[in-house]
């Protein structure tokens, strides 16, 4: 638990592609990625992510420090969401992505998105996206936690 930063990517694509279907979520609708990125930037301003925590868990705190949240276009039909934080709640990334997709489909306004986050109620947020498209991309540790002592081992 000595990691100071974790980065996840969640992959989505539009066209049928047998090579992507195991690693990316296929979507059948247009999305407004500019609006989704605007909503994602709001995540950098908040610290309580109770709205995106799996229901009925005994987590001690829903506080997280999100330092990066944005959609990146890979091609004309593929994107990924990148999010970095000091810690994540169970199901948090998939719930964030599902809620951002509601924004991108114009089913939720930016103001409603902010209200969902502020309300800290999981039932107000969007659906959790499937897990097969979520990948842990990077974990960073404090330099002092990685010091090797020859007498103690790692």
Locate predicted features.
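Structured-RNA-binding interfaces characteristic of tRNA pseudouridine synthases
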Residues: 1-154
């Amino acid at each position: 638990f000595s990691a100071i930063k974790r980065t996840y990517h969640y992959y989505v694509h539009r066209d049928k592609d047998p090579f992507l279907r195991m690693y990316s979520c296929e979507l059948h609708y247009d999305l407004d990625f500019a609006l989704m990125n605007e909503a994602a930037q709001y995540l950098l301003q908040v610290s309580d992510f109770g709205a995106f925590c799996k229901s009925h868990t005994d987590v001690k705190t829903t506080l997280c420090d999100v330092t990066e949240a944005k959609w990146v276009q890979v091609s004309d039909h593929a994107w990924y969401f990148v999010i970095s934080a000091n810690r994540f709640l169970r199901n948090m990334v998939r719930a964030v992505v599902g809620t951002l997709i509601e924004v991108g489909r114009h089913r939720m306004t930016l103001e409603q998105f902010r209200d969902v986050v502020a309300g800290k109620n999981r039932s107000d947020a969007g659906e959790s996206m499937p897990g097969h498209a979520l990948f842990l991309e990077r974990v960073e540790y404090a330099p002092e936690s990685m010091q090797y002592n020859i007498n103690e081992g790692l």
